[in-house]
Every structure is written in structure tokens, then in C-alpha cells.
Amino acid sequence: MSKVKKITVSGCHLTSAEEIIERLPVKSKKTYFFKVNKKQVETEVEKMIFVEKATVTKDLIGNIKIRIKENNASLYGYINNILYVADQDGIFEQDQQQKWISYVQRCPQMMNFDEEHFRSFVKAYVKLPSVVQNQISSIVFEPDEKDQTKCKLELDDGKVFYVRIEDMEKQLTSTNYYLVIQSYPDYKYYDYLGKKCLCIQLNSV
């Protein structure tokens, strides 16, 4: 029985082909070719950061080709001086060598997060509409005794939203965002921690 001869990866720029191949359950010259399940390989590759879609093909002589369609970074932050990067699907990884630092600096930075709350925030953030994501410049984790998941979202125009991680997806829909901004365009602080959004004028703080 023949084994996989060669695995090639194309279409990746943010991650290297070598990194993807190293993480695969399929190994060249070790895995039997007939055991390779294309869908299973695609699923495994799509669990990796910056991979939106993977397409796997096999030829008749034992080679496997993987075509990658990448997505983009969405957030980054430091935890214990280690860079963490999240993509648009909510997958995140440590980047101890900071190989992505120049790429992710255009994304909103998360500050004061531990890994648990970093994970939960990213999961909620990627579900926000793009009109909201595109306005956010930085996120600060500010828990207190009353609100253990309180976050401050700083927008590009100087406005500030206060939200809880677990409520953020429901509160910051496109409709709610436009309604609040259009109703109170000159306000700076928008507090979503209560049942209704509390808005505070620029000159009152």
C-alpha cells in the first residue's frame, strides 16, 4: 500500500506552508494515501488562525495539495508580555516571536485582559456587525465588583462605549448602534451596563 508522497500548500501569506503542514494529522511518507480523508483535512486546516477556507485535492500518484483562502486579523493584545492575535473567525494564538506585530497594529488593541476574558471577548466581538467593529480603536478590560466583565470600547471619533462581554452582541446590533448614535450624536459616553443605554454629553464629564 502506498503512502502520501508529498504535501504542498498554496495561498497562505500570514502563516507559512511549513507551519500548516506541521500541524496536519496527515504526514508525507508516513500516512497511507487511501486513509486520507479530504474533508477531515480541510476541517483541521480551517481550525488554524487566518484560514477562512481550505480546499484539498489528491492526485493519482500520492500527492496532496491544499489551497488556502485567508481571512484577516481582527484584534490583538498582550497578556503577560506575550502578543495574542485573533482573526475574523475568532481563532486566536500566541505570537511569542511577534512575527505578526506589524500586520496587526492596524487592528483594535485589547488591554488589561487575562486569557479567559480575552477568549470570551473575541468570541463575542467577531459576531458584531462590521459597522460597529470598524469604529473601534481599542478595548480596555475594566472589571469591578459590580461588573466582572465590564469593557470600555474606545471609538475612532472619541466616543466611548461601556459594555459587558456577555451582553455586547445583543446590545451592539447595527440597528441599536445607529439608533443611539443618531439620537445622541454629540454625546461622548454611552453606558450599556444598565437595562437601557445611558448617554452622557461631552461637556458633562
Regions flagged by a language model, labelled:
Residues V4-H13:
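Juxtamembrane extracytosolic/periplasmic "stalk" immediately C-terminal to the first targeting helix
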Residues C12-T15, V36:
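Short coil/turn linker and secondary-structure boundary residues
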